[in-house]
């Protein structure tokens, strides 16, 4: 039965799809958790993210451009972190309004466990769409969601392992 006072979690979204995976990150659990709360790192990892800022309410606001099949949409939305059971378990959720293209929600439940000096990061990513994007069909949306979540966590792993560095926030200088 449903508990009436329970707040809606991403697992209760309708028409959603789930995909899970796990990666091993060569860093301590605290470092991994801290990094997943770091705006610069999140911005670098979120595919198509053009802007990510923390507003006065402590919520993260994002501007993201995504191509889903033939539709290229610009989303404005917010990203929320649920840290109730951190650092072992927490969730990231984002929802964005793409105007005429419709809306998209995406999120991941993340579970961290220590493995020697490394951290195993398991995630269950979820996505839901509405409006024009939803009419593109479940298969396309599922494959796009899978691709995007994989991009996010692959990039995260590369940043954490030092394979990739964070983009500088200064305006890029022209390379001669």
Regions found by a protein language model. Name each.
Residues 2-5:
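Intrinsic-disorder-associated, low-complexity terminal segments enriched in Asp/Asn/His/Tyr and depleted
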Residues 9-59, 63-67, 155, 172-176:
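Hydrophobic ligand-binding cavity/cleft-lining segments
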Residues 13, 96-143:
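Beta-strand/loop substructures that line and gate deep hydrophobic ligand-binding cavities in soluble
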Residues 18-24, 59-61, 74-76, 89, ...:
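Intrinsic-disorder/low-complexity, polar/charged segments enriched in Ser/Thr/Lys/Arg/Asp/Glu/Gln
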Residues 21, 50, 76-83, 106-114:
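Hydrophobic/aromatic beta-strand elements that line small-molecule binding cavities or substrate pockets
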Residues 42, 69, 98-101, 129-130, ...:
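Short beta-strands and strand-coil junctions in structured, solvent-facing domains, enriched
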Residues 54-95:
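Glycine-rich portal/gate segments that line the openings of hydrophobic small-molecule binding cavities
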Residues 132-174:
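A conserved amphipathic terminal alpha-helix motif
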